[in-house]
Amino acid sequence: MNTSISEIQRFLSMIAFEKELVSEDFSVVAGIDEAGRGPLAGPVVASACILPKGKVFPGVNDSKKLSPKQRAQVRDALMQDPEVCFGIGVISVERIDQVNILEATKEAMLQAISSLPISPDILLVDGLYLPHDIPCKKIIQGDAKSASIAAASILAKEHRDDLMLQLHRLYPEYGFDRHKGYGTSLHVEAIRRYGPSPCHRKSFSPIKQMCAIV
């Protein structure tokens, strides 16, 4: 993992929100992010993460900017550190179809917060306002600006990828191991050929249209 001075400085620049909030007497800051709002299949997953003060985590960045190998390394470093607190929320395809993806995403985030081992004083949420008893601050593109949100984005992404690999073993014909449920040409062609599986989001327009054709 890159532990160069520039990488450490980059991480330190990403804890500005957290340091500002601590100076305002919000002692415990949790970053919240999700993975899987856009795919045509699989659950939506959220993570809440509280990073320990004064500790540097090289590699923590927006999960979309990291390679799979880098993400896995950072995920392992976060999960193996006893001072890092995190929670995971998973909302099923059935629930997504029932309430819509935005509401399902919020439910996943609330689940993740509830599963934290300690209660935060304030929530930093990537791109969404989350109704909660705990004060909430929405940060646009927060996974690129806040270390806590970036850590949450990595934990959520890695957890969801693991779930999609499990689904791949059940439905190998769709290639979930390659695209994780996103609407690639390979995935769309597989749906056309085999029809939607139980883990496809029937409320999403492309799936809905293909169901109508079938």
Curated annotation (Swiss-Prot):
One Gene Ontology CC term in the entry: ribonuclease H2 complex
Catalytic activity annotation: Endonucleolytic cleavage to 5'-phosphomonoester
* Class of the enzyme per the UniProt entry, highest EC level: hydrolase
Matches recorded under Pfam families: RNase_HII
Q: What is its EC number?
A: 3.1.26.4
Read off the NCBIfam families from this record. PRK00015.1-1, PRK00015.1-3
Name-wise, this protein is Ribonuclease HII
Native species: Chlamydia pneumoniae (Chlamydophila pneumoniae)
Q: Recall the taxonomic lineage recorded for the source organism.
A: Bacteria, Pseudomonadati, Chlamydiota, Chlamydiia, Chlamydiales
